């Protein structure tokens, strides 16, 4: 019986925090911008993109460019 109360308590804590929008549930399935860049064939650079490449997005939270 105590374990069911504990599970219910944990569930309430998770669901009560959902109004802020920053729970761990919103991060499920979310990939970092660096991962998406490299998986798409690009590379993350802090400097300008090399010749014959274009900026396709950002990396590291907008601090670098994804060049492809």
UniProtKB/Swiss-Prot annotation:
Q: Name one GO biological process term.
A: defense response to Gram-positive bacterium
User: Would you indicate the residue range of the signal peptide?
Assistant: 1-21
The record places propeptide residues at 22-32
Give the Gene3D superfamilies listed for this entry. Antimicrobial Peptide, Beta-defensin 2, Chain A
Taken from the UniProt record, the cysteine pairs bridged by disulfide bonds within this chain are 37-66, 44-59, 49-67
Superkingdom is Eukaryota
One function term, GO molecular function aspect: CCR6 chemokine receptor binding
> What is the annotated localization of this protein?
Secreted; Membrane
The record's Gene Ontology cellular component field reads:
extracellular space; membrane; microvesicle; sperm midpiece
Q: What is its main location?
A: secreted
What assembly does the database describe for this protein? Monomer. Homodimer.
Family, per the entry?
Answer: Belongs to the beta-defensin family.
Q: What is the protein's known function?
A: Has bactericidal activity. May act as a ligand for C-C chemokine receptor CCR6. Positively regulates the sperm motility and bactericidal activity in a CCR6-dependent manner. Binds to CCR6 and triggers Ca2+ mobilization in the sperm which is important for its motility.
Q: What is this protein called?
A: Beta-defensin 1
Please name the source species: Saguinus oedipus (Cotton-top tamarin)
Origin organism lineage? Eukaryota, Metazoa, Chordata, Craniata, Vertebrata
């Amino acid at each position: 019986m105590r374990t069911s109360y504990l599970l219910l308590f944990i569930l309430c804590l998770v669901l009560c925090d959902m109004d802020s929008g920053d729970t761990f549930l919103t991060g499920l399935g979310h990939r970092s911008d660096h991962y998406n860049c490299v998986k798409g064939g690009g590379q993350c650079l802090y400097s300008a993109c090399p010749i014959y490449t274009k900026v396709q997005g950002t990396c590291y939270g907008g601090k670098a460019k994804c060049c492809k």
